[in-house]
Amino acid sequence: MEEAASPARRRGGPAGVSAVQTDTIEALTELEDLERVYAQLCAEEAEVQVELDALVGQQNNIETKMLSLQRMGPNLQLIEGDAVQLSGMINFTCSLAENVSSKVRQLDLTKKRLYQAIQRADDILDLKFCTDGVQTALRNQDYEQAAAHIHRYLSLDQSVIELSKQGGEGSAVEASLALLQEAERNLKTLVTTRLEEAVATGDLPQVERFFKILPLLGLHEQGLARFAQYLCSQLASKAEENLILAVGSDLGERRAPVIFADTLTLLLEGIARIVETHQPIVETYYGPGRLHTLLAHLQKECDKQAQKIVDKFIQQRDYNNKFQVVQSNMMRGMTTDKIEPRDLDPVLCEVTLMNSRAELYFRFLRRRIVADFEVADAMADEAVIQEHQQSLEQLLKNCQLSRTMQELIGYYIPMEEYYMRESVNKAVAMDTAEVGQLSSSVVDDVFYIVKKCISRALTSSSSDCVCAMINHATSVLETDFREVLVCKLRAGYPVSALQDLQRGVSSAVSLMQSSLQQGKITNLTQTLGIESQEQAKSAYLVTLNNVEVCSENISTLKKNLESDCAKLFSQGASSDHAKEKIDSCLSDLVNTSSKFKDLLQEGLQELNNTAIRPQVKPWISSFLSVSHNIEEEEFSEYEANDPFVQQLIVQLEQLMAEFKVGLSPVIYDTLTSLMTSLIAMEMEKTVFKCTFSRLGGLQFDKELRALVAYLSSVTSWTIRDKFARLTQMATILNLERVSEILDYWGPNSGPLTWRLTPAEVRQVLALRVDFRSEDIKRLRL
């Protein structure tokens, strides 16, 4: 409808009225104006016609909608009636609810005022009861009952009391309040004085009696402080007595080496017993969350007594002087004033034991305080919980006992490192190899020392101490001890008396120089080359075995330490960060194993080059002296009396017999593998220098098979891959015709992977005297 009306609006008048007025048309006189107006009227007529057509087209749709609206009329009337009825019901319900709720509110207000009146009456009665009761209790010296009345008075609603003072009974209330306030002051003074007297005389029943009364008077902090004062006096008395006994104990007693650790343990166990005994009393009478306050007072006394014990320990064990001597030795190298490792052993054990007891004590305190705070903070907000957590950490980490233990461990770590290094040097100097043993004593001794030092650090329950000692152990094994083995292997495997002497002199000079420069103790007498040749050979083989055992021991040590550290972690002794640090240190330790494996490979390569290569090369070269350009008669003779391979096998058997006895099975296997690679390489070079007939190629194939079979029997390594090129050469030398190679080459090779290049194949074919060079050149490989 709007679209139909729009042209009329554009024409500036109502619908159906032209924009050109009749008067205007009558006034026109010019033909051009008439034509223009006529054209305009024609255009308007066309627009009107379009509008009419549109309206006529919408007629059916409009009539349908109107009919639909007419049908909806009765329903709309029904809906209107229902809506009016619903509105009336809602208005009625609203009025009814308003009336009921107003009465309920009035009833609630009345009930509240009634309760307030009852509460006020009860409080006034309680006030009167407390006033009478506290006076009677004080006269009878029943301080518990008097405190209960005062506690009841303090728990009354102060606003109700103020209202009562303003009411008709105001004077009576004021009088009762005055009496109660005076009784409160007197009772607080009396109970505090009696508690101080009981603490001074050490009367435990009276101390506990008045300690239980103070929280009823609102004196929680004072009660805990006075009770802690009594406990501290008892603690100090017992600790001083134990320290006197420790200082005066006989040095021959069984526990004499750890007497100060035992004394510290008694002190800490005493505090633990106090907590276990009196924590229920504190929780019952003072409520949860108060244990931290009591322990804060006790910890101060613990710090004093622990410091006395540690001071006596430092004095009696000459701890600081030992540390200074050790530090001087480690910084300046060898000095005349030197401590024997065995003199440090008992001191180090006692220090770790003391720290272990302190860590156990701190874990005990943490568990008890955390459990106490959890009950108290059940409904507390996050800020209070964080505050309690911070106060706990401050108590445990900033106390004097914690700092003292850190100082002791700070001295312990370099002393333990010194003990480890000196003991390892002694083990190296005292190294002996028993007859029939593959390795010498130094390996077991060194790893016993390393394990002992790290295990002792573990007993301290300090993750930082454990990390430090694992790192020091890694350094000792990786540098000091490995360097000893390197120097022994650097002397080489003697092959003759003259070479042995020359090698020994040169090695002695280099080792003496490195020892002087690095300050390391090495067993030079075993590498000077002055012992017999057989002893030098045995020493070299023993060193190889030592290197292998070291590599295995490091891996075993790492696994054992992981298990020990897991036990330490399961006791809650370390955080996640500490676990990550220890895991990182253990990873560095096990990485040292690969360096020993590399050293073993170097030593075996040296042994292979020195003892095996000079022997094997001439044996393989003897293959040249055996003609392989043979006929039937010679082939039969070779079959009856093998000219090469059997002799070679016997020679190899004799050569490796010494190593089989002197080396571990794993090392012997590896050495055999190196020898196998050498044989394959030298054999290949030698074959290229020979010429073959058809039967000669067959003889070579038999010799190669016998050699491979023997070498496979003496090693668990797979050696066929090393002889793959030689096997393929034997195959080529066995061909009847040159063209037969094409049955094995290229797409006809099947699963066979050729290790020989086309040029090498032609070179092998050229070794056959009966193959023409023209046929070989014509091959397309």
From Swiss-Prot:
Main localization (coarse): cytoplasm
Keyword Transport among UniProt keywords: yes
GO BP of this protein: Golgi organization; protein transport; proteoglycan metabolic process; retrograde vesicle-mediated transport, Golgi to endoplasmic reticulum; skeletal system development
Positions of the UniProt region annotated as D domain: 614-736
InterPro entries reported in the protein's UniProt record: COG4, COG4_C, COG4_M, COG4_N
Bilayer topology: Peripheral membrane protein
Chain residue ranges for the region called E domain: 737-781
GO-annotated cellular components: cytosol; Golgi membrane; Golgi transport complex
Cysteines joined through disulfide linkages: none
Keyword annotations from UniProtKB, A to Z: Cytoplasm, Golgi apparatus, Membrane, Protein transport, Transport
Disrupted-gene phenotype: Zebrafish mutants are significantly shorter than their wild-type counterparts. Mutants have craniofacial defects with a smaller jaw, smaller inner ears, slightly smaller eyes, and stubby pectoral fins. They exhibit malformation of the inner ear, with abnormally shaped semicircular canals. Mechanosensory hair cells in the inner ear and neuromasts have reduced numbers of hair bundles. Response to auditory stimuli is greatly reduced. Animals show defects in proteoglycan secretion and reduced collagen COL1A2 expression in fins, but normal collagen type II expression in the jaw.
Entry similarity comment: Belongs to the COG4 family.
Assembly and binders: Monomer. Component of the conserved oligomeric Golgi (COG) complex which is composed of eight different subunits and is required for normal Golgi morphology and localization.
Protein name: Conserved oligomeric Golgi complex subunit 4
Native source organism of the sequence: Danio rerio (Zebrafish)
Taxonomy of the source species: Eukaryota, Metazoa, Chordata, Craniata, Vertebrata
Name of the gene encoding the protein in the UniProt record: cog4
